[in-house]
Each structure stands twice: as C-alpha cells, then as structure tokens.
Amino acid sequence: MFGYVRPCRPEMKCREFDLYRATYCGLCRCLRRRYGLLAPMFLNFDFTFLALLLWEPEERFTPCQGRCHANPLVKKPMCPDSEALELAADESVILAWWKLRDSIKDEGFWKAMPARGLSLLLRPSYRKAAVRCPAFDQQVQDSLVELEQLERASCPSMDQSADTFARLLQGAASKEGKQDRVLSQLLYQLGRWIYLVDARDDMEEDRAAGRYNPVIARFGPQGDDENLR
C-alpha cells in the first residue's frame, strides 16, 4: 500500500521542492547509518512525507551538503540528522517489514519468493527498529491481525476495514509516548484514503485471484467506479 503519497512538482515552489529533496536524501542517509546498506532500498515518497510531518516547528534547519552513496562524486543538499528523521527511519523499517510479511501471506509460494528473501535480509534491521519503537510495532501487528480477521469474515463494511488500517498509520504520530492530536488525525485520514484507493486499484487482480477486497465485498463482483462516487 505504498506509493500513493507523491510530491506534485509543478505545484511546489523551488524552496519547497528543495526542502523535500533534502529530506528525502537525509532520510536515505539516516536509514543507511542506522540500519545498513539494505534499508535505503525501501525508501520512498511516503516515508519522506512522514518525516516532514514528524518534524517539530522549532526544528527547522538549513540543509547541509553531503555525498550520496549512489553518486559520491556530487554533493547534494541533505537534512542534518534529527529526531524526526530517526523516528521516520525506524517506523519506515517496521512498515517495510510488515509489508513484506503481508505480501508473503497474500501471494503464492513462488510469487512470494522475492518477499521472503528480502524479509530475511531485513529481519535484523526490523528487530532493531522494533526495540526502538515498540509501541508502533505493536500497533502495526495488532492492526494487521484485526485486518486479517476482517478479511477472513469477508467484512462488507468498507469503513470498518479502512478504520483498522487508518489506526495502523495513526500510530506513527506517537513520539516518546505522546501523541500529537493534529498529526494523529491527519495520519488517520490519510490511512483511510490510502486503504480505499489501494482497494480500488487492486479490484481486478483481487477479483481474478478470489482474494478479499473491501470494495468487492461492499458492492459485489460487478462493483465499479460509479458505485464509489
């Protein structure tokens, strides 16, 4: 369910895009520093957006220049290390791990082989991240168990299944046991949107494979975009 939160480059001012790019590169460096060479493979726009949301207003910064491991000959603007980047890196690893485990469960044996291999390589990093963010890791586990139960019951309520996934993402708003109310609600609503859009995109594939899909469960096998409006 990753890949839906992307920057709209034409609508961004130059300084906004520079900040976004510096955050992306800073998060990549933070992932590599905390979790090794494999972790940056899971970096995406969703996690960059999460890092920006986790930043405290008083933590505004001036991007520094650093060398990218992908192109070490050229220096790029990067965010300096911060609590927001470290928290985003930890939560990114946890989400990536459970996404792989979910893929293994949903796909057939052979089709899930790449996810199995990646999960084995990511396991040490996941264990380290789970120690650093135990509450978030537990929230993700609990939400996925609840989602699995709803799927087995072929739950016809789109709201109920979307709410379960939204609470998973909402857990990322917690910082040292405290939860920012505004950020919490933003991530909750974002989680609902991601879940429903992903369900719509997966309709044909899930219908062909006979897998649970909340849109199909609600509107039947012939559900279409007209039903969703």
Per-region residue spans from a language model:
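Acidic catalytic motifs of isoprenoid enzymes
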Residues: M1-Q185, R192, L196-R229
